[in-house]
UniProtKB/Swiss-Prot annotation:
F(1)F(0) ATP synthase produces ATP from ADP in the presence of a proton or sodium gradient. F-type ATPases consist of two structural domains, F(1) containing the extramembraneous catalytic core and F(0) containing the membrane proton channel, linked together by a central stalk and a peripheral stalk. During catalysis, ATP synthesis in the catalytic domain of F(1) is coupled via a rotary mechanism of the central stalk subunits to proton translocation. Component of the F(0) channel, it forms part of the peripheral stalk, linking F(1) to F(0). F-type ATPases have 2 components, F(1) - the catalytic core - and F(0) - the membrane proton channel. F(1) has five subunits: alpha(3), beta(3), gamma(1), delta(1), epsilon(1). F(0) has three main subunits: a(1), b(2) and c(10-14). The alpha and beta chains form an alternating ring which encloses part of the gamma chain. F(1) is attached to F(0) by a central stalk formed by the gamma and epsilon chains, while a peripheral stalk is formed by the delta and b chains. Its main location: membrane. Keywords: ATP synthesis, Cell inner membrane, Cell membrane, CF(0), Hydrogen ion transport, Ion transport, Membrane, Transmembrane, Transmembrane helix, Transport. It is found in: Cell inner membrane. It comes from Saccharophagus degradans (strain 2-40 / ATCC 43961 / DSM 17024). The gene is atpF. This is ATP synthase subunit b.
Length: 156
């Protein structure tokens, strides 16, 4: 193997090329790789933050869902209580109305009984007068014997 001038020239050219690349090309490649590494790291960080945010949002949504269910249960319970209260009030009102109607009917019955008694007293008094007229054969003066008729009516 002969080392000639061509091999030395190629070696010098290769060394010059390496020095040129190290001075001008290599720093730009390193800067681009560092920038890309930085962007990848930021992307991974953002993904981690997004995962944490998602987990936090899921916890918050679960908490809100639980609160909403509790509120719905409370509202349903209150509605049931109010419904039962309305039913009880309606029952009480119906009982009171029934008692009022019963009392009114009882008063009406008593009034009609009293009226019937008065009518019967009047009829009995008239029959007594007619019977007395027939027995005595004379007309009995109702005005003269009104006290007697009143006593008789009161006794009946």
């Amino acid at each position: 193997m002969n080392i000639n001038l061509t091999l030395i020239g190629q070696s010098l050219t290769f060394i010059a090329f390496i020095l040129f690349c190290m001075k001008y090309v290599w720093p730009q490649l390193i800067a681009m790789m560092e920038e890309r590494e930085k962007r990848i790291a930021e992307g991974l960080e953002a993904a981690d933050r997004a995962d944490k945010d998602l987990e936090l949002a899921q916890k918050k949504a679960g908490k809100q869902l639980t609160e909403a269910k509790e509120q719905a249960a409370t509202i349903v319970e209150q509605a049931n209580k109010r419904g039962n209260q309305i039913v009880e009030e309606a029952k009480e009102a119906a009982v009171a109305e029934g008692e009022r109607i019963k009392a009114a009917a009882q008063a009406e019955i008593e009034r009609q009984v009293a009226q019937a008694r008065e009518e019967l007293r009047g009829k009995v008094a008239a029959l007594a007068i007619q019977g007395a007229e027939k027995v005595l054969g004379t007309t009995v003066d109702a005005k003269a014997h009104s006290e007697m008729l009143d006593k008789l009516a009161a006794e009946l």
